[in-house]
Amino acid sequence: MRVIMAEVFNSWQGEGGSVEGSAFGRRQIFVRFAGCDLHCAWCDSREYIDASRVSSWRYEVKPFTGRFEYRPNPASVEEVVEAVLRLDTGDIHSISYTGGEPTLQVKPLMALMERMKELGFDNFLETHGGLPELIRDVAPLTDYASVDIKDESAKATEDWKGLVLREVESIRILKEAGAKTYAKLVVTSETKVENVQWYASLLKGLAPLVIQPREPIEVSQAKLMEFYREAARIMGRKNVGLSFQVHKYLNVL
């Protein structure tokens, strides 16, 4: 079985804050898949959106060195497993599957998750959540999940509200399968408080929410506090947190 990869590397998980399901501050091995069906305005992996144009993938030769070697796409599942094992430092919290959107290649994703389970690792899924029918396949293999709630300002798709409802359905599927799951909302200066209230009402009693300002941070502290306050009012004060891309401040991937 083969998969169109982007990269494999060892780093800290820099997102997620302190809500249940987050691995913030934990060391992970990141397995980044190529290909995404959305086009978010703030995407920081834009070079990997069109999987057909990702002719090679890279893997870190030694943890935290930033030294990579390249191989042609598509990769075999065993090649990816070998790259992961080469980066196991003995203190790995979980394997993070990210993208792009990993569920678009659901069969090799499941094969990798199954193999990592056999090797004793926990699986951490980072997903936009817009494909609940595929989430249903991977949910039983998932220990932790970060699921996006795409704000209207992301301009990810024309059917924005439909996307949000599918994301919430994916969260429900993951929670029912036993995965520790949280929702991640990236906010901007264009984010509307009434939209944050809507997201919070959908997530109430289902999963915690982290609010993450887009980098570089442009949203005001006053607006950020308003978003937080309104989400906490609806969801409960212990079910909301802030998230920042701390790995960028540490100058690591």
UniProtKB/Swiss-Prot annotation:
It is an enzyme of class 4 (lyase). This is 7-carboxy-7-deazaguanine synthase. Its EC number is 4.3.99.3. Binds 1 [4Fe-4S] cluster. The cluster is coordinated with 3 cysteines and an exchangeable S-adenosyl-L-methionine. Binds 1 S-adenosyl-L-methionine per subunit. S-adenosyl-L-methionine binds at residue 100. HAMAP family: QueE. The lineage of its organism: Archaea, Methanobacteriati, Methanobacteriota, Thermococci, Thermococcales. Catalyzes the complex heterocyclic radical-mediated conversion of 6-carboxy-5,6,7,8-tetrahydropterin (CPH4) to 7-carboxy-7-deazaguanine (CDG), a step common to the biosynthetic pathways of all 7-deazapurine-containing compounds.
